Amino acid sequence: MTVTVKMLVTKVKLDVVYATDDLLEKEITTSDISRPGLEMTGYFDYYAPERLQLFGMKEWSYLTQMTSHNRYSVLKEMFKKDTPAVIVSRGLAIPEEMVQAAQEEGIALFSSRVSTSRLAGEMSYFLDASLAERTSVHGVLMDIYGMGVLIQGDSGIGKSETGLELVKRGHRLVADDRVDVFAKDEETLWGEPAEILRHLLEIRGVGIIDVMSLYGASAVKDSSQVQLAIYLENFEAGKVFDRLGNGNEEITFSGVSIPRIRIPVKTGRNVSVVIEAAAMNHRAKEMGFDATKTFEERLTRLISKNEEGK
């Protein structure tokens, strides 16, 4: 995903000090944010100009103690053509030399009243998610009881129809057909729709329907964490399926593993209700309530009791 300076400005609500239309369209290529330190003393070895440059109270205080000439020289050296933008936090007064250097070198300059640490966190969160490598997978992503569930299966097995039934039951559609998944961190997987498919469901025999138009804004969601994968497969006599729910199967996307449950599909089975139950059961397991474990413990106690009675 391409991220521009304008997108960052809109997301974190930065105030424009200096920026042309061309500078607002400049691409941000890394989520790393630099807070200049040694650079202000004139040491530029290992300086990373491709990063956003963030000035907080410490950096601003050091700058204000410099002479006007030195301040201008350092800032002009710091502002490179690869630098996407410079931001000054905490509503601090921006030195004239900084504005002059930004204009001469063609660098967008912004200010914010937000504290430095909070602003850095907001920008990093947005950039990490936006710049993360996307993997497109086939399936339907639903928000079921607040849990992101990725429904997959063979073509024509009824994934979209199941998604529609879940929407009618009060759950929310995130994406249909193509789901773009990405890792926000080492343990968190998120999914979102392709822009062209946002809020749309394709139902065989009906065509494409706009879920938001038919069922309202409460029936859709722009993105969701992906916490559970469900794979729908045709029921086959003699094929072994997990009946106790202790298979512990996982699937990995973008380096993040999530649990996967296989659900056999056959005529007359209400798949949407089964998926609801699977989502609630998974949440219960995360909270420490494992029905399978409880059953196994009861079975063990019963066997022990029967053996003692012999």
UniProtKB/Swiss-Prot annotation:
InterPro entries: HPr(Ser)_kin/Pase, Hpr_kin/Pase_C, Hpr_kin/Pase_Hpr_N, P-loop_NTPase, Ser_kin/Pase_Hpr-like_N_sf. One of its GO terms (molecular function) is protein serine/threonine/tyrosine kinase activity. Its cofactor is Mg(2+). Its EC number is 2.7.11.-, 2.7.4.-. Gene3D superfamilies: HprK N-terminal domain-like, P-loop containing nucleotide triphosphate hydrolases. Residues 201-210 are annotated as: Important for the catalytic mechanism of both phosphorylation and dephosphorylation. Belongs to the HPrK/P family. This is HPr kinase/phosphorylase.
